[in-house]
């Protein structure tokens, strides 16, 4: 499977076209809208989320609630477009109109794509860069992820994302009873944190950063349960599932690090404290005594829960902006200010869920590759049975 997205942050709409979804997948507009609404929530979101009421329009590839096997096209309209029709319109304008146009940007923001993108594409107005590099694009990535999560759900695979850390405040309570309980608790948390006390402190940290005109980042974790053994491959670098997951997580706006299982902590431990001992269980078959490697060995799944974490840096748009240089005058100035969040880590956990779900669903569809959803489900069950009886 693959998908492409199109659209600017303040353009008329965002679009994604998804190719390769098996026929017979049960998917509705409500399934996608539910994920879009989750992305919009979270303590620390900016005023833009008060304007947008993200809902998907399915324009192809689904009939009567089931996928057809043809490309699925999804559209999410931008409510804010009505305020930007002239500034972001596609029709040509005169030189006089361009010189009078408001909201042109010549002062790049440190940490953003503004300056590098302007140099690369030759844009004197850096709005041409920031409109596409904006995290608003993740709206339709979450929509694509919603389709992937439906594939996984119909194969008995569950995905849950939550927040482990914001602004230096760490969740101490992380031993959730079940993935269902993890979902229940985090959906009720304004910061999507399983540890309620830590969640309150995270909210205080976000409020303090906002009051100071600053922003803060954090760490999110995605857990996937029910993936059969052997998804991925050790044969080539580009078929290793952990490499695909790492690339997907790092492709999320502002993400600068990724780890699996105990992650970088493995560098400070002996091998006997890192690797997961193999045991035999009468019901499960081969399993592991621990899950320090996060459900992945040799580029393949082990049957244990997949555990992926991503590090999100603070958002680079600051209401107390850093020093920059005006590209027209070359004079020092403070950077431009765009309406933004003070912390988007809770929402980013939903985006991380989406991209992780996509990569796993894609690997399963590729590995058990047939064009019908029910036949893929049959093949996945055969693999589970084979692993138990091996």
From Swiss-Prot:
Pathway: Metabolic intermediate biosynthesis; chorismate biosynthesis; chorismate from D-erythrose 4-phosphate and phosphoenolpyruvate: step 7/7. Signal peptide: none annotated. The keyword S-adenosyl-L-methionine does not apply. GO terms for molecular function: chorismate synthase activity; FMN binding. GO terms for cellular component: cytosol. Homotetramer. It comes from Bacillus licheniformis (strain ATCC 14580 / DSM 13 / JCM 2505 / CCUG 7422 / NBRC 12200 / NCIMB 9375 / NCTC 10341 / NRRL NRS-1264 / Gibson 46). This reaction introduces a second double bond into the aromatic ring system. Belongs to the chorismate synthase family. The gene is aroC. The keyword Amino-acid biosynthesis applies. InterPro entries: Chorismate_synth, Chorismate_synth_AroC_sf, Chorismate_synthase_CS. It holds the Pfam family Chorismate_synt. It catalyses: 5-O-(1-carboxyvinyl)-3-phosphoshikimate = chorismate + phosphate. It is an enzyme of class 4 (lyase). NADP(+) binds at residues 39, 45. This is Chorismate synthase. Reduced FMN (FMNH(2)). Its cofactor is FMNH2. Its EC number is 4.2.3.5.
């Amino acid at each position: 499977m693959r998908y492409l997205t199109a659209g600017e942050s303040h353009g008329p709409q965002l679009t994604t076209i998804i190719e390769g979804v098996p026929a017979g997948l049960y998917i509705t507009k409500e399934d996608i809208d539910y994920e879009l609404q989750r992305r919009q929530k979270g303590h620390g979101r900016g005023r833009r989320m008060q304007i947008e009421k993200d809902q998907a329009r399915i324009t192809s590839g689904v009939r009567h609630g089931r996928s057809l096997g043809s490309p699925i096209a999804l559209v999410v309209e931008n409510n804010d477009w009505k305020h930007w029709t002239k500034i972001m319109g596609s029709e040509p304008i005169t030189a006089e109109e361009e010189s009078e146009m408001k909201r042109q940007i010549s002062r790049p923001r440190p940490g953003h794509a503004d300056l590098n993108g302007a140099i690369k594409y030759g844009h004197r107005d850096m709005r041409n860069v920031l409109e596409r590099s904006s995290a608003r694009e993740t709206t339709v990535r979450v929509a694509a992820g919603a389709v992937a999560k439906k594939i996984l759900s119909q194969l008995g695979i569950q995905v849950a994302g939550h927040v482990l850390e914001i602004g230096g405040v760490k969740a101490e309570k992380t031993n959730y009873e079940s993935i269902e309980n993890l979902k229940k608790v985090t959906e009720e948390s304004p910061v999507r944190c399983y540890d309620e006390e830590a969640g309150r402190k995270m909210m205080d940290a976000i409020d303090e950063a906002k009051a100071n005109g600053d922003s803060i980042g954090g760490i999110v974790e995605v857990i996937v349960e029910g993936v059969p053994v052997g998804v991925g491959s050790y044969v080539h670098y580009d078929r290793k599932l952990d490499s695909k997951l790492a690339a997907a997580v790092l492709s999320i706006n502002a993400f600068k690090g990724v780890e699996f299982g105990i992650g970088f902590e493995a560098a400070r431990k002996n091998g006997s404290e890192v690797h997961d001992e193999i045991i035999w269980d009468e019901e499960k078959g081969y399993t592991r005594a621990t899950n320090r490697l996060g459900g992945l060995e040799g580029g393949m799944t082990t049957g244990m829960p997949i555990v992926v974490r991503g590090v999100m840096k603070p958002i680079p748009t600051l209401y107390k902006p850093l020093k920059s240089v005006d590209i027209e005058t070359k004079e020092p100035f403070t950077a431009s200010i765009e309406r933004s969040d003070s912390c988007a880590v809770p929402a980013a956990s939903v985006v991380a869920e989406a991209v992780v779900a996509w990569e796993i669903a894609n690997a399963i569809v590729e590995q058990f590759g047939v064009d019908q959803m029910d036949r893929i489900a049959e093949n996945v069950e055969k693999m589970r049975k084979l692993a138990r009886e091996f």
